[in-house]
């Protein structure tokens, strides 16, 4: 399905439901009530859908969280913030998440949203090895299904499951 048609459909639906659409760019802050997100990208000078991916940074309960959208290596920030939780860019593509970026962000937990047996081979071995080299614990939706993180003053608790939490639950705790 054509991505531009999906966007047009979403905009039409938002208009129909009277939902306001706002454009964010680097330097903006988004307040959702529970969290305040710093918008790190897109930068105005970037072109292309992936290059203009929304990149958000927030902190909660002492945990630093960086969400990178589909940001390619060519558009990575020169000085990315250190983070405890990283949503890995572009499903772990070879065109995203450089070794240098990971050395600067040093995530403890890396989340990869990716479909099982996808035709692109995501996530790539290079990205998985780079995440391993910085000591990140990797959670992948193709292997674990839904990934839920709970943040508390005691640390981060992760639960993953494909079907039901009672049958396939895996819990892990981290202290940032």
Where are the model-predicted features located?
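Non-globular, low-confidence helical/coil segments that flank catalytic cores
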Residues: 1-176
């Amino acid at each position: 399905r054509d991505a531009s048609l999906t966007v047009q459909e979403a905009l039409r639906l938002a208009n129909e439901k009277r939902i306001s659409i706002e454009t964010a760019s680097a330097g903006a802050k988004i307040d959702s009530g529970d969290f305040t997100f710093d918008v790190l990208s897109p930068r105005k000078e970037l072109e292309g859908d992936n290059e203009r991916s929304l990149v958000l940074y927030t902190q909660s309960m002492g945990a630093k969280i960086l969400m990178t959208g589909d940001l390619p290596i060519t558009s990575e920030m020169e000085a990315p913030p250190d983070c405890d939780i990283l949503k890995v860019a572009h499903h772990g593509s070879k065109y995203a998440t450089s070794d240098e970026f990971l050395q600067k962000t040093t995530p403890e937990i890396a989340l990869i949203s990716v479909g099982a047996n996808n035709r692109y081979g995501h996530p790539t071995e290079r990205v998985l090895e780079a995440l391993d080299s910085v000591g990140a614990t990797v959670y992948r939706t193709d292997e674990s299904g839904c990934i839920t993180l709970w943040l508390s003053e005691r640390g981060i608790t992760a639960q993953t499951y494909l079907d039901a939490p009672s049958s396939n639950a895996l819990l892990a705790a981290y202290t940032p």
